[in-house]
């Protein structure tokens, strides 16, 4: 199992979509939400994802295809 930390930034068109639910359900990725901020027109979430390396790669590719910006987090998001 591989664990990674990422920040997901959602465009307005995806704010109401169950993106994280689909990530967990469709890709069997374990997530841990560390911090988030969601407004009517913008949202982001910092989270840890854990799964097999190829599963994480597929999940991240799917997020990007949907229009989610995926940025790696190098340090702990809880400070």
Give, region by region, the residue ranges found by the protein language model.
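Long, contiguous binding/interaction regions
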Residues: 1-79
């Amino acid at each position: 199992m591989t664990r990674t930390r990422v920040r997901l930034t959602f465009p307005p068109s995806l704010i109401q979509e169950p993106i994280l639910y689909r990530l967990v359900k469709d890709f069997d990725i374990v997530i841990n939400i560390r911090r988030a901020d969601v407004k009517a027109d913008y949202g982001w979430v910092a989270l840890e994802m854990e799964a097999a390396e190829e599963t994480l790669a597929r999940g991240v590719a799917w997020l990007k295809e949907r229009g989610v910006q995926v940025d790696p987090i190098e340090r702990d998001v809880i400070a």
